[in-house]
């Protein structure tokens, strides 16, 4: 298909941001290589995450004790992801019931310094995923000397209009051009989708 395996970047927002993070932070972790083409690296060279989750153990952090309590429930999405649903004699479990499993399912649990460059964007007014999730990822990557940028977008919430404006789009496109250095980078400079 003419894809350069040395210039692969991933981007996602919200749940896709979580997937983008997991893809970037699991570079080189063979337990995630499944299926066909196992002779080809699944590593990526750049990752962009937009208002994604980085730590399943603290999803409610930054929103107050009432929201924290919601995320302690065995019925919370993150608890179901890690522990599965309640069934017959199994009552379910909170996300903190197995901290090791929760961290294994969290991007923060995989940061080891081998990550590609990251661009992390979050809305300053996000009511669904606290900006603390992105700030924690940024600090963890920087602590391991990973090339990472964190942009807190003023007046942006969770997938609302500010995300689809020229300044945000250009920031992401130009970052990919800088990091992945496409062959025709001169033509791509300042590109707008």
Task: Kindly give the residue locations of the regions a language model identified.
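Short beta-strand/loop motif that positions the catalytic acidic residue
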Residues: 114, 119-122, 126
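Serine-hydrolase-like catalytic core of hydrolytic proteins
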Residues: 1-11, 20, 26-27, 108, ...
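Residue-level signal for short, function-critical loop segments
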Residues: 53, 124, 154
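Primarily recognizes the serine-hydrolase "nucleophile elbow" in alpha/beta-hydrolase
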Residues: 1-67
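Acidic catalytic loop of the alpha/beta-hydrolase fold
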Residues: 55-56, 125-129
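Catalytic active-site module of serine/aspartate enzymes centered on a nucleophile-bearing elbow/loop
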Residues: 165-193
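Mobile cap/lid helix-loop segments that gate and shape the active-site cleft of serine hydrolases
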Residues: 24, 61-110, 116, 143
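Catalytic histidine-centered segment of alpha/beta-hydrolase-like enzymes
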Residues: 156-166
